[in-house]
């Protein structure tokens, strides 16, 4: 009789098994880290870091630029970088420097100034403590 009661108890418990389903609601759908977007897509989404390009171009020139305009490009560059994964920030900045070198034919001291500024941009923006690895020999 005790065996029959135990079997009934087990059968009854099995009949009332509960299934719990959890769902994660992704409210941050615009965040590239959540979408698993690659660097190329992130860079394109940020207009190829056009504000970083303007800012770095002004940084590499001695004088002859509007300081308010430069600050605005710096802020917008930081905004663009903040929307990207850390490793993509550096890749994007390498592309900016490469593009500037090709378009403007930068050499010597101007090129060195641009490379130095680009290396430190994520840190200067306060979005990363990293220093991007950008070598002049790559260009």
Curated annotation (Swiss-Prot):
This is 2S seed storage albumin protein. Expressed in seed (at protein level). Expressed in the peel of mature seed. Residues 1-15 form the signal peptide. Residues 107-110 are annotated as: Minimally required for IgE-binding by the immunodominant epitope. Disulfide bonds join 39-88, 52-77, 78-125, 90-132. InterPro entries: Bifun_inhib/LTP/seed_sf, Bifunc_inhib/LTP/seed_store, Napin/2SS/CON. It comes from Juglans regia (English walnut). Resistant to heat. Retains its alpha-helical fold after heating at 90 degrees Celsius and subsequent cooling to 20 degrees Celsius. One of its GO terms (biological process) is seed maturation. CDD domains: AAI_SS (cd00261).
């Amino acid at each position: 009789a005790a065996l029959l009661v135990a079997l009934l108890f087990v059968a009854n418990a099995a009949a009332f098994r509960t299934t719990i389903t959890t769902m994660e609601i992704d409210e941050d759908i615009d965040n590239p880290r959540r979408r698993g977007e690659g660097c190329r897509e992130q860079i394109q989404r940020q207009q190829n870091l056009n504000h970083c390009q303007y800012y770095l171009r002004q940084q590499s020139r001695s004088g002859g630029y509007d300081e308010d305009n430069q600050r605005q490009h710096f802020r917008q560059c930081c905004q663009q970088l903040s929307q990207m994964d850390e490793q993509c920030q550096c890749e994007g900045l390498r592309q900016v420097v490469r593009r500037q070198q090709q378009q403007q034919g930068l050499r010597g001291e101007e090129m060195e100034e641009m490379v130095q500024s680009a290396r430190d941009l994520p840190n200067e923006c306060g979005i990363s403590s990293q220093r991007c690895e950008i070598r002049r020999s790559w260009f």
